[in-house]
Every structure is written in C-alpha cells, then in structure tokens.
Amino acid sequence: MDKVLNREESMELMDLLGLERAAWGNLPLMRKAYLKKCKEFHPDKGGDEDKMKRMNTLYKKMEQDVKVAHQPDFGTWNSSEVPTYGTEEWESWWSSFNEKWDEDLFCHEDMFASDEEATADSQHSTPPKKKRKVEDPKDFPSDLHQFLSQAVFSNRTLACFAVYTTKEKAQILYKKLMEKYSVTFISRHMCAGHNIIFFLTPHRHRVSAINNFCQKLCTFSFLICKGVNKEYLLYSALTRDPYHIIEESIQGGLKEHDFNPEEPEETKQVSWKLITEYAVETKCEDVFLLLGMYLEFQYNVEECKKCQKKDQPYHFKYHEKHFANAIIFAESKNQKSICQQAVDTVLAKKRVDTLHMTREEMLTERFNHILDKMDLIFGAHGNAVLEQYMAGVAWLHCLLPKMDSVIFDFLHCVVFNVPKRRYWLFKGPIDSGKTTLAAGLLDLCGGKALNVNLPMERLTFELGVAIDQYMVVFEDVKGTGAESKDLPSGHGINNLDSLRDYLDGSVKVNLEKKHLNKRTQIFPPGLVTMNEYPVPKTLQARFVRQIDFRPKIYLRKSLQNSEFLLEKRILQSGMTLLLLLIWFRPVADFSKDIQSRIVEWKERLDSEISMYTFSRMKYNICMGKCILDITREEDSETEDSGHGSSTESQSQCSSQVSDTSAPDSENPHSQELHLCKGFQCFKRPKTPPPK
C-alpha cells in the first residue's frame, strides 16, 4: 500500500474520507467512507465540487495501483512469437524468458553422504504415525444433561442458555452475546479444551434465535446451543471439577438465593367445598339462585337487613359462616363455574339417594327438612306467626271432609309406589281448591309440576324435568268434549293417555334433558288436576282415586278477608299440611325417626293454640270472616280444654260433634248460631260470662 500513493496523497485522501490515518489499507472501510463522502461532496447535494473531484482522482488512482500491485507480472507473449524449438532463435528467446524468474527457485539436488549411509537402516524402521484429527463434540457433557432442555423442535422461550464451542470462538461470543442481548449475567467456563458460555437474558428468547446468531460467527468451528431448565444447578456444576471459571460478568458469581424470589403473601383462594356444602344443605338446584344467594354473604353481618329481619332461614343461618369466603368469591372470575359444580353435587347426591334409599326414608328426610325450617321461622330468630299457619290448617280442613285422612292416604300411595296404583285425580270446576291442595302436597313431598298440554314433540324435554324427583303433578290438564263451552280444549288428556307406561310405573322409561344423556328410571308417582273434562276409560283405569272438588262460597269469602294466606302462600306450603297432620294424626302414624320431634311440636301447639282458638278459626271460615278475628276471652272451661295428644284432640272433636247431634228442638239447623256447610257440623261455643 505504501507504493500505491505517496505519503502526501495518502494523507490527503484519508482526510477527504474522514478516516484516521491508522485505517489506511482497510479497503472495505475506505470504500464505505468513499460512498458516504460522495453523497456529501456531490454538487447536486450542495457539496464542494473541488473536493469531490480531488477525492475521485486520488481514490481512482489508489484503486488502479492496488489492482496492478496485486497482479503477478509473468510477462506477456504470444504463442505465434515462439520460435522453433532447437534453433538458435529459440535458445535466445528462452534465455530472455527466464531472466525475470526469482533465483530463489533454484534447488540444489546434491545429496548428503549421511543420508546414503542411513538409507539401509531407515528401510527397516517404522515410519512415524500421523496425528489423528480430533473430532468435534456432538453434545454437551453427559453430566450436564439433567440441567439442560433436550427439546429440538420447540417454540418455547427461555431466559437462560448455554453455548458449547471452541476456546477461540468462545472469547468472541462472550463479548458479542453481552452486547447483543444486554445479558443480566454471563460466564465462560473451561471444559476439556473447549469452552461453555452460560448466560441469563432480561427477556425470553427461543433457542433457535440464539443458535442462529452464534452460527454467523462460527462458520467452521462447532457450536452447540441449548436452553437451561435448572439455572443455578448448572452454574454450580460448571464451577466445580472438571470445569472451572475463566471469566464472568459479576464478580463472585451467582448465589442460590438469586433464583429464589421472595415469597409473596399467600393469596387466599375461594373455598369451592364451602360453597358446595351450602348448596347441599339448602338443596339448591339453580345455578343463578345459588350465585345470587352467595353474593349476598359478602356484606357485613351487622349491617345486613335480611339478618335483622330473620325472615329467610337460608340467609341469616349461614351468613356469618360464609362471610369471609363470600368476599373472595365476589372477586373471583369463575363464579358461575363454582356454582355449577356445587349444583351438580346436589343433583348427584339426590341421584345416589334415589338409588340407595327407600321412599319412606326419603320422605322422612323431607319431613326433617321441613321441621328444620319450621324450627327456624317459628323460633326465637324467626318472624313467622304460628297462628297464621294454623289458620291455613283450619281452612284446608274445611276444604274436604277428613282432610287429614286424605293427606295420609296420599302419602301412603306415593311411598309404597305400587304399579298401576300410583296416581290420584283431582277434578273439579274453577276455584274449587284442587290446585291449592296439589301445590301443598307437592311442597310437602318434594317434586316438580309438569305441563302436559304441550304438543307431543315438545313433551319429551318436559317429562325430563321429572328425573330423580320424588313425585310430580300434571297441573291443569286440558281435554276435549267438556260440557261447559267456557272450558278451552287441549291435548293434555290425549297426551296422558299416550303416557300409560309413565303412569303405570311397571317398566322403566327413558327421560332426557337438554345437554344431558338419557336417564332410564321408573317415572315418579303423583297426581293430576283438571277441570270437568271427560276422561277415557283407558286413562281412568290409571287413577287409584279420584276426588271431586266443589267451590264453596264461604271458603272464598274467608280467603278474601284473610289476605295473609295468599300473600305468604300459606295454603300452598308443605309446612301447613305437616302442621295439619301433627294436629290431627296420632304420633304412631309418623316414622319412628321423627316421632320425638312430632311430640315436641304437639306440645307446642297445645300450649299456643287451644281447641277453643282452633274452633273459632273454623267458625270464622264458615262465616266468611277473617280467620284470625278471634275475641280472646279466658275461661277455665274453654281454655283448659287443650289437647295433650292427638287422641285427646280427636275425642274433644267427637264430643263437640255429639253436641251438635242433639234434637232439632234444642239446636235447630235454622238457628243463626248453628252452621252446617258441607262438613261435620258443630255448635258455636257459648260465650263465657265475664269474670
């Protein structure tokens, strides 16, 4: 390069290129600077034209001289100019052709004498072995495999890598990786004549990205790049024999606690089990109902209005227990999934009970559930009035003769579930009380009401509601050919006639719900309510008993004057029917498992509701008055009447009836104080004299 340009020209060119003098001879760098200065000095770009011309002149001269200097000068000759071999002209041409060759190419071919002497001995000696070429490693040392990722084709991103290469390339890669990825930590370790680079990056990368970057710098040298699964364990192994540290970016290296972050405060998780227990205890089968009820528990117990009123036992009884869990539940993102699992648990438990428990045990469990509810709402923390429910008992007792026997017989029917003797029919005109009694029986036993008036193609999923139910009610079944033209026609009776296998209960039938598999089971027993439609004989044979209802004006008037019965749905409540059974039936009629609780409730009714009070309730019903419009007057003869047991109460009722059976001259039916409205007549109690 010193012969290309003289010193002044070379210095001038480097100044024009804007490079340091030490860069003279770095042709790629000079070429890059030349192109850059061309844009700067070009006249069209607003540059200096003189500098542009001078720089072009010097740079072109340098390029030309460098090209000539690198070409070997062998002389130029043409084959036609070579004279004939052997002539004097050829000898002179050959001499002139060889003048330019370097004399160093001359070789002395004389042999040393010592070589000749040693020839004989050397012929019988073994020639020296050639050095074997050392093969490059194919993988990391085997003792490090447990710390490395062995994935070959993976898009997984990591933040720790290990590179295995030659010692020379490792020195270059150590700096290049540090600059390229701004590594958090990097170290170089000796390994059997080669190097291993261990480094941590602040961001996650694919192994292929690290490998591609390193391959650009390792054209001939071997390179193995892998991700690290156990960072500190690998680093610790590289610091012990047979490895040792050459250099690292942090003095002292890494410590174990660098990879063990401080444990954050343990985040509280929602207790799915606690929510499931609440759903099972309350027998909640509605996902959204359970979701709404549980979200109400997140508010402070002391400020909760429902807990202060104590009118909802499923709330105030569980609020304090579930308060802490409800706060976490309110912030959860999978509330519906939690509630769905809880509801599924309730349905699963019901199915197990249906399979393993007898129907009598299931009814006893249902009675226990109702008694628990009665203990709550009629207890110290409840706000229900026992007299109002006993008013409902009196009203229902006036609905049918011997109502307690009717209910008892129906329970006997659904408990034993005898094939072809499982269904009752409630038939009567509008507002005769059949639906009221059916709703109460449904709530007493537990079950579902079904609409059988749908078209046959839609009836499949309606019947699927009866899966795992104790009983069903086919409500307000419509038919054709009614005597009254006011009654609408429908497909209900025809559909029921097509469901004889369902009503008989002799064989199992397939029931299905949407999004659920078919369930094969005996269809549950129950009852049917309808208006005065004609019933085919084939369907009539499926009913073990038919009760004809008739509307009673005094019941309607009494109900209108006692609005609390409708507002609180007392007449449709299973608690009312259970109180009716407790009031009229003997303890022996109940299951032995609940007889002790029945005795407690009989004693409570004796202490709070006297026979006089109950008789006044029935009298007000017959008069069409408000049932609780009772004048409280104390009299030893009437107030002492109480009924310590059901047998006693029955004897008192019979004595009361015997009073009414006196001759007509004493108590004629035409008198104002005597009532006979389609049930057992009784005499109005005499008004006791004042104290």
From Swiss-Prot:
Catalytic activity reported: Couples ATP hydrolysis with the unwinding of duplex DNA by translocating in the 3'-5' direction; ATP + H2O = ADP + phosphate + H(+)
Annotated ranges, domain J: 12-75
Low complexity: compositionally biased ranges: 645-661
Keyword DNA-binding: yes
One annotated GO biological process: symbiont-mediated suppression of host JAK-STAT cascade via inhibition of JAK1 activity
Chain residues that bind Zn(2+): 304, 307, 315, 319
Residues noted as binding ATP in the record, renumbered to the chain: 428-435
Short sequence motif named LXCXE motif, residue ranges: 105-109
GO molecular function, one term: DNA replication origin binding
Enzyme class: isomerase
Function recorded in the entry: Isoform large T antigen is a key early protein essential for both driving viral replication and inducing cellular transformation. Plays a role in viral genome replication by driving entry of quiescent cells into the cell cycle and by autoregulating the synthesis of viral early mRNA. Displays highly oncogenic activities by corrupting the host cellular checkpoint mechanisms that guard cell division and the transcription, replication, and repair of DNA. Participates in the modulation of cellular gene expression preceeding viral DNA replication.
Protein name per Swiss-Prot or TrEMBL: Large T antigen
Species per Swiss-Prot/TrEMBL record: BK polyomavirus (strain AS) (BKPyV)
